[in-house]
Regions:
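Conserved catalytic cores of phosphodiester-cleaving nucleases, focusing on short active-site segments
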Residues: 9, 110-140, 153
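Short aromatic-glycine-enriched beta-strand elements
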Residues: 16-21
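Beta-strand/loop nucleic-acid-binding surfaces
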Residues: 27-41
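Acidic-basic catalytic patches of nuclease active cores, encompassing PD-(D/E)XK
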Residues: 40, 72-101
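Flexible glycine-rich surface loops and low-complexity tracts that mediate binding to linear polymers
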Residues: 44-56, 205-206
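Nucleic-acid nuclease catalytic cores
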Residues: 134-144, 154-183, 205
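Domain-level recognition of nuclease-like catalytic cores that cleave nucleotide substrates
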Residues: 170-221
């Protein structure tokens, strides 16, 4: 996926989950943050960031904060909408006969439903932006929705669907994602139960470009 236009900035602070103050060309701008997660280990004062320039003149904010430079790691794409977009592009190249985003299964909306021949597939997508000592972790904040989705996938797997949870690693040099049990042990338990039921765990490694994010490798978890 590609962004329309990118500007460079320096992160100042984040008054709330939705906005941040960023210095752009010597002036402090209020920008929209495309990730409501905490991201405390990423958004440090003085850190270099990348902003997508909005083409909507009616918007209150001119910029969206989409990437941040993490010391010792490199650029991290922190756009929470990016994982589903890149997976949609990636799935289109995987030979499925039919792909439907935002598929209702049970009481959940699963990110993707696919068909290939007679086989039906479900895939839930999780974006990973948290790195500690060279390992990716998910979630960075408790997610009851994420736990619920894993239970739904395990149930669907038992009913004949081929199910997968795909972790999109939104940074380079990281090849695996582990459940962040210190933040939410329930997610780790649900992931283990889903794997035991036959749900596939995928790590999707990405190239983080200046104005793009692209899946370049798939690994089994």
């Amino acid at each position: 996926m590609k962004y329309r236009e990118i500007a460079d900035g320096i992160f100042v602070d984040r008054p709330n989950r939705f906005i941040a103050h960023v210095e752009v060309n010597g002036a402090v701008e209020t920008v929209h943050v495309k990730n409501t997660g905490r991201c405390r280990e990423l958004l440090l004062p003085g850190t270099a960031v990348r902003l997508e320039v909005s083409d909507n003149p009616k918007r209150k904010t001119k910029y969206d904060l989409v990437a941040v430079l993490k010391q010792g790691l490199g650029w991290v794409n922190m756009d929470s909408q990016a994982p589903n977009k890149v997976v949609g592009e990636w799935l289109a190249k995987q030979g499925y006969d039919y792909i439907k985003p935002e598929f209702t299964y049970g009481k959940s909306r699963i990110d993707f439903y696919m068909e290939k021949g007679e086989q039906k597939y479900l895939m839930e997508v999780k974006g990973c932006t948290l790195e500690v000592d060279g390992i990716g972790y998910f979630p960075d904040a408790p997610t009851e929705r994420g736990v619920k989705h894993l239970h739904e996938l395990a149930q669907a797997q038992r009913k004949g669907y081929q199910c997968a949870v795909a972790f999109v690693i939104q940074m380079e040099g990281i090849t695996e994602v582990r459940p962040n049990v210190s933040t939410q042990p329930e997610f780790g338990t649900a992931l283990a139960e889903a794997k035991a039921a036959g749900v596939q765990v995928l790590f999707l490694l990405c190239h983080v470009g200046r104005d793009s994010l692209e899946i370049v490798e798939q690994r089994e978890g």
